[in-house]
Amino acid sequence: MSDKNGEECWYALKVFYNRVFELEKQLSQEGVRSYIPLLHEDTVAGDKKIRKRKPAVSSLMFIRQSEHYLLELQDRMKASCPFMAYFDRETKKPAVIPDREMELFMQITSADTSDLEYFSDEAIDYRSGDKVRVTGGPFKGAEGYIKRIRGNRRLVVALEGIIAVATTYILSLIHI
């Protein structure tokens, strides 16, 4: 999948100094779709319960835009909010994330659960397990691989070359 004729695609970014929320705000003002895998931390201040957003993976965010816009934004933001796009080693261009992979990743990482574990793409051989589709629960419809991690069977969904996320074990599965 390439970015021909200004086609919008998903790209992964490493935002320096963990300024993901600053970049998210800027992108929102420009009408650009972005996604940050988040954790929600509940804290108590006095008698108020406060829920804070925190990046699940430091400095990682995704945007959906054209390659031209991405490169122009990178140049424009280098002084105030520097970031780099993950590059495809073969094409030497920003790595395009297929829409289906990104949808599955967002489905898993946006579930309101603290039982997710993130890995660099090289840290786990996620393709060695059985490919499955979840048929019930909060991850219904998600596809990934079953992998044994620290003795437990887990569902792993990966964005190749970027990151992998493992859920708790899911009982309702269909082998693909």
Predicted regions and their residues:
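N-terminal intrinsically disordered, low-complexity, charge/repeat-rich segments that act as generic
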Residues: 1-83
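Short beta-strand-centered aromatic/proline hotspots
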Residues: 141-148
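Short, conserved beta-turn/loop elements at beta-strand boundaries and strand-helix junctions
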Residues: 149-154
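Conserved small/polar residues in nucleotide/adenosyl-binding loops
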Residues: 175-176
